[in-house]
Design a protein with these regions (language model features):
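N-terminal leader/targeting segments and the immediately adjacent pre-domain N-terminus
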Residues: 4-13, 19-110, 134-138, 167, ...
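Structured C-terminal helix/loop/strand segments within mature extracytoplasmic catalytic/sensor domains
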Residues: 22-34, 340-385
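Active-site SXXK
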Residues: 97, 115-141, 165, 232-236, ...
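Short, charged, amphipathic alpha-helices and their helix-cap/turn boundaries
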Residues: 98-103, 146, 181-218, 242-261
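Extended ligand-binding groove/face enriched in aromatic
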Residues: 116, 152-208
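Active-site helix/loop module of the DD-peptidase/beta-lactamase fold
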Residues: 135-177, 214, 238-280
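Active-site-proximal alpha-helical segments within enzyme catalytic domains
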Residues: 228-235, 274-298, 347-363
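Active-site Gly/Thr loop motif
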Residues: 259-262, 307-358
Length: 385
């Protein structure tokens, strides 16, 4: 097992714990943190929350084929062996825009399920930053965020280079690992502790100001920090002069050809929770994965941004070491030449540029991911690089 894999597994063992109704309760010995009721709600998505705001399906849906035998393909023995019904709920494998295998834990989900994604939303936020750069709203990632966002001025996030916000290295707080990505107890109490109930009421900028320790100049140390992502959303809004969700809908969701709409959690003041809470159908996550791979391969502004986004920009501190991190994107991800979007409990969109293999996972335990990663490597080995 390589160092990156070990570090990501360490991340899983610690888990990105989200507290629901004031408690985090282990429900089994497979690493699930949170009640079965929490995960039942999570599997249904968060669009029912009164503070969720929707994005529409794309006017032009991109191609995604579904093999006729995808529920019982030649990969069934391999996937079934890796799939743990105690913690795994959906696994979808797709090769170059063709879904080759699907598996659903029918106790909890079905083909119509639209689970939430937790911190996978962070990676979506980075994609929006890339589009803002390529549209000319932002000149480059080596400028300070305060050049574009007056509300971030005087904070660590405003002083930080945009590159460093993307790499989770704002320097705002002491680099001490937080399993939730909340740098202070107040941030935890006012965001994740309330987000899954639709009860976030605190204005995010004032919360950031209170949490800002101005620990170090940006770029010195990676720290998984939800507020770095939130700063990026404000940056996009202020640079483009549009609501983040409107810009994201047009530049990412419609551009990649989503077949269904999605929704994103907001606070009661209408500020997007950029760090968590995007809900969509798994097929559209798969479409997004292929879109990222295809755009990354192009010699365009966005292609260059994606290449940077998927190369090491920082080392994010973990309980037992650190992990390579790009622009709001995890690197390594269990082998091959992969990078991935990760969320609490094992939500995952995994992509391999050399093979074109994309995997979507909805689960309740990140620490139980090892079998799925081994399966992914085995499937990837069937495709020439």
């Amino acid at each position: 097992m390589n160092v990156r894999t070990k570090n990501l597994l360490a991340l899983g063992l610690a888990s990105l714990t989200i507290f629901y109704a004031g408690a985090a309760l282990a429900q089994n010995n497979k690493g699930q943190i949170g009640t079965d009721q929490f995960w039942a709600d999570f599997s249904k998505g968060l669009e029912w929350l009164p503070t969720s705001k929707s994005v529409s399906a794309s006017p032009t849906v991109s191609n995604l084929e579904i093999a006729t035998d995808s529920l019982n393909s030649s990969l069934s023995p391999l996937v079934d062996q890796a799939f743990d019904p105690d913690v795994h709920r959906i696994v979808i494998l797709s090769h170059k825009r063709s879904i080759i295998h699907r598996k659903y834990n029918e106790r909890w989900v079905n083909e119509k399920s639209r689970p939430s994604s937790a911190s996978m939303a962070k990676s979506l936020t980075a994609l929006a930053v890339g589009k803002a750069i390529c549209n000319g709203a932002i000149a480059n990632v080596d400028e300070s965020a305060s050049v574009y966002s007056s509300r971030l001025r005087g904070t660590s996030w405003g002083n930080a280079k945009i590159r460093h916000l993307l790499a989770m290295s704002s320097g705002s707080n002491k680099p001490v690992y937080s399993p939730t990505g909340s740098p202070t107890p107040q941030v935890q109490a006012e965001t994740l502790a309330k987000s899954y109930q639709g009860k976030m009421t605190h204005e995010f900028v004032s919360l950031m100001v209170k949490a800002d320790e101005k620990y170090a100049p940006s770029g010195q140390q990676g720290l998984y920090n939800n507020l770095d992502t939130q700063a990026l959303a404000f940056l996009v809004e202020d640079a483009t002069r549009q609501k983040f969700i409107e810009f994201f809908e047009r530049e990412i969701w419609h551009a990649m050809g989503a077949s269904q709409g999605g929704s994103w959690s907001h606070n009661s003041l209408g500020q997007v929770a950029a760090f968590s809470g995007f809900t969509a159908h798994p097929y559209d996550w798969i479409r997004l994965g292929h879109y990222v791979l295809e755009e990354r391969a192009k010699d365009t502004c966005f292609g260059q941004f994606l290449k940077e986004a998927t190369t090491r920009q920082s080392q994010v501190v973990l309980p037992n070491g650190s992990a390579a991190y790009g622009f709001q994107t995890w690197l390594g991800c269990g082998g091959v030449d992969t990078f991935c979007f990760l969320g609490h409990g094992g939500q995952r969109l995994q992509m391999s540029p050399s093979t074109g293999l994309v995997m979507y996972v909805h689960a309740t335990s990140l620490s139980a991911s090892q079998s799925l990663l081994a399966m992914y490597r085995s499937v990837a080995s069937r495709y020439p690089k």
